[in-house]
């Protein structure tokens, strides 16, 4: 008799990268995960984030980030900052930079063409984006955190729509 067991397919792994991993990339991590959860694909996606620098390793997301997320119905309280490592290339299908400076750093860290091919800018996925860079709200006020979150939501929706066919299991 034919074996009817199925082989589980590994989830699609995305890591979002900003500077300190306390503002932009945690927002993107949470929003992308919520996009997957909203259509029943949460188990098919692993959304993480990291920073190019190590200044905030182990810290929670900036309180203004958590507040902006909460105002839009997201929960970012489980986040702890970490620094991007070379292992992230091997453990990810896609490495999403929040601005061009992060993209340059990541390309410099890429060990080979396979690593480099995984790197993309988040805003490049949003056809309506006025810029390729998500501005750093760290030295700004509440309004900028809300604006940045809105940019991330729009680009994340576009990214998810483009990835969904590859994420959705074939039945």
Regions found by a protein language model. Name each.
Residues 2-91, 161-171:
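Conserved active-site segments centered on acidic
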Residues 18, 69, 96-97, 152:
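Hydrophobic structural packing positions in well-ordered secondary structure
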Residues 2-3, 94, 100-171:
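Phosphate-binding/catalytic loops
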């Amino acid at each position: 008799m034919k074996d009817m067991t199925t082989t589980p397919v590994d989830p699609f792994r995305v890591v979002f990268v900003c500077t300190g991993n306390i503002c932009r990339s945690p927002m993107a991590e949470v929003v992308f995960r919520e996009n997957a959860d909203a259509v029943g694909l949460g188990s098919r996606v692993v959304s993480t984030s990291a920073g190019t620098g190590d200044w905030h390793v182990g810290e929670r997301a900036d309180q203004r980030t958590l507040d902006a997320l909460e105002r839009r119905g997201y929960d970012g309280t489980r986040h702890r900052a970490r620094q991007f490592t070379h292992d992230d290339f091997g453990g990810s299908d896609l490495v999403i930079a929040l601005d061009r400076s992060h993209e340059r750093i990541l390309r410099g860290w890429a060990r080979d063409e396979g690593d480099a091919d995984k790197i993309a800018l988040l805003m490049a996925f949003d056809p309506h984006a006025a810029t390729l860079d998500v501005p750093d709200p760290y030295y700004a006020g509440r309004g900028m955190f809300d604006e940045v979150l809105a940019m991330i939501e729009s680009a994340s929706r576009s990214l998810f729509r483009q990835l969904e066919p590859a994420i959705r299991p074939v039945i």
